[in-house]
């Protein structure tokens, strides 16, 4: 259909309405009036980021269960009109005379989407790219999303060597003939370690009810435990990821009743990158693959 000469953009999310008006004014000659061709933007109070775009000759409506999902729908619709968000300071804005788009819907393939580079920290640009990293500098009016607590390496936070090593060296990795304090991990077959970590994670969750993902992840170096108990399991499964997944699974089981919607995050990284032969993560466990050894110049 021909691009309407007069458009009315309305909705219950002011930021989405503002963005739609901004870009339509940049790519068309349309004017805005409350009596114009209706474009209705509606967001719910949930966290689902799927959205629906319904288009006919009488109106356009974009709907989502969440504000962030609605905003993604707005940017998706604009991209189908030819707009391109290339960088935080570079956009392609075509002149548009027609709307040749059929109704459609979209749902993210990944619940959490992040790019580890400086450009993705720009909140407005990251949302246009449909990223939902909690590291990006987004503002409240851009809508809420999945919240990631403590994001990365957490073993030292869960069991601090400075606090525990002198009195309980058995809590930490055994390698090179002794328990190690520096550049070490934790002994994940030690039941006391599991108990301490489980209680710490439960406290994180109780203290941060607006977060859904909590990291139980190895420190940023090698040093996996090679004590008899750990080594026996890891050798049988062919990787030091075996004791890690068993450990994380146990915490995931412990938090599930009180926090059925929360997830435990961990890494497949360095000595844990290779998957175990038979051990499978629980449904409420997220594994983040970190192939740091790979050459990123080749596909």
Describe every region a protein language model picked out:
Residues 2-7, 11-23, 48, 55-213, ...:
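Feature activates predominantly on carbohydrate-active enzymes
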Residues 36-38, 213, 263-265:
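Residues at or immediately flanking beta-strands
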Residues 47-50, 225-226, 274-278:
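Short, solvent-exposed polar/charged micro-motifs at secondary-structure junctions
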Residues 265-296:
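Substrate-binding cleft/loops of secretory-pathway carbohydrate-active enzymes
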Residues 50, 261-263, 284:
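A generic structural signal for alpha->beta connector loops
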